[in-house]
Amino acid sequence: MIHKLATLTLFLSFFNILFGHCQVPCGVYGDSARFTQMLEDQSTIAKAIGQISELTGKEDAQSANQLSRWVATKEDHASKIQKIIAEYFLTQRIKSSSDKYDALLKGAHAVMVAAMKCKQGVDVKNADSLKSAIESFQSVYEK
């Protein structure tokens, strides 16, 4: 029994390290770092969309390989943004007692939807909308 409990504790500790801000809660927060990271992820998404457009239609193996890698990169960075919103802001930083609660929820939702749209297509307008949503959310959050 103790062995199973120790194994479970170790697994959960490892899982927590891999998948999100600690959720202890540790009280160590870096809001500006999270916004910087989301904007960096958005820039990567925008670059990926451009590269996907450039590589589409090419038939050589290298282009096919690069195309699939850029698609995966776009998906990954959009998911990272959604994870930051869900696991950092929504669960730890946005409080229902805040006067800005509704505006913050709307802003967080807009970021998550914009990231989802980036996953669904390759229109650079979606990447631009994502950047605007992040900046708008940051503006409300930092007021």
Describe each PLM feature range.
Residues 5-14:
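Sec-dependent N-terminal signal peptides
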Residues 15-21:
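Sec/Tat signal peptide C-region and signal peptidase I cleavage site
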Residues 35, 109-143:
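C-terminal amphipathic alpha-helix
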Residues 49-63, 92, 115-125, 141:
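Secondary-structure edge/capping motif, primarily at the C-terminal ends of alpha-helices
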Residues 49-88:
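Alpha-helical segments in soluble extracytoplasmic regions
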Residues 65-72, 101-105, 127-133:
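Short, charged, amphipathic alpha-helical segments
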Residues 81-101:
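Short, solvent-exposed, charged loop/turn and helix-capping segments
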